[in-house]
């Protein structure tokens, strides 16, 4: 293995049912000679997403190379499991790309922190190369955003609690490079405009790609070099507003008183 080898990682996030597994399957089916390793995380004891990938014919049931990170979340309880899998994938020149499908309840920022911390974990962690985060794609169900979140209006109201679904959806939109606006044909032009306006308000730096059934040009998602932790972490509108206040403080008055599945395209 050549020292200093770097392998790009695509992180796919999004709430349950948004289309993450559909996107993953389509990437694998259109790999065009790219050797992928895939890590799939499902919060339940049975990894439904991994089963769907197997059902799609990309892998066989009982394949020893199919390992799912399950019964936990890679943004918290399974962070070191994720590190160990990524480090293990760097052994041998077996693949060109790593795709991670996060659980629908995962917050993307802690996952990004975990991946980006691998180079600081000592020589053993990087002896075979370094997996680096290339891009975070959040898949958003346009119809659900329209029907359950008022075309996104409820996401811009900051009175929801930390454990509320709105908070999770907002975090997934705010901390990404690309928003894949899926099922777009199922909403009206008016709702589409409102949804895009909301997404842009939450994350002005994210590119919005409209699609149905996650049919996209995969060259827009792979080898993008889009991810920069500092820029992504400060792309959210509320953070930008705080930064503006710090840069331009108001006049001051004195007063008293936080699957692993390896696919070798050569076998096709």
Listing of model-derived features with the role each one plays in the protein:
Residues 157-263:
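C-terminal accessory "lid"/substrate-recognition subdomains
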């Amino acid at each position: 293995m050549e020292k200093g080898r770097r392998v790009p990682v695509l992180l796919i996030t999004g709430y349950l049912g948004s289309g993450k597994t559909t996107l993953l399957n389509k990437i694998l089916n259109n790999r065009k000679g790219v050797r992928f390793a895939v890590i799939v995380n499902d919060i339940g004891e049975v990894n439904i997403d991994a089963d769907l990938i197997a059902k799609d014919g990309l892998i066989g049931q009982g394949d020893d190379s199919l390992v799912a990170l399950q019964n936990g979340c890679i943004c918290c309880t399974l962070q070191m499991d994720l590190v160990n899998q990524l480090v293990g994938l760097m052994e041998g020149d077996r693949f060109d790309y790593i795709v991670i499908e996060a659980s629908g309840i995962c917050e993307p920022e802690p996952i990004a922190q975990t991946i980006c911390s691998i180079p600081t974990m000592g020589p053993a962690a990087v002896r075979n190369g370094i997996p680096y985060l290339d891009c975070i794609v959040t898949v958003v169900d346009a119809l659900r955003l329209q029907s359950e979140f008022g075309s996104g209006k409820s996401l811009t109201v900051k009175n929801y609690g930390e454990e509320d679904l709105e908070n999770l959806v907002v975090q997934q939109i705010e901390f990404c490079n690309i928003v894949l606006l899926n099922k777009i044909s199922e909403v009206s032009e008016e709702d589409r405009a409102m949804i895009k306006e909301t997404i842009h308000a939450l994350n002005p730096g994210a590119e919005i790609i409209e699609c149905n059934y996650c049919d996209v040009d995969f060259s827009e998602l792979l080898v993008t070099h889009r991810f920069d932790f500092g820029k992504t972490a400060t792309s959210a509108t509320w953070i930008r507003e705080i930064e503006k206040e710090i840069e331009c403080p108001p006049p001051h008055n004195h007063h008293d008183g936080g699957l692993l599945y390896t696919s070798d395209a050569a076998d096709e």
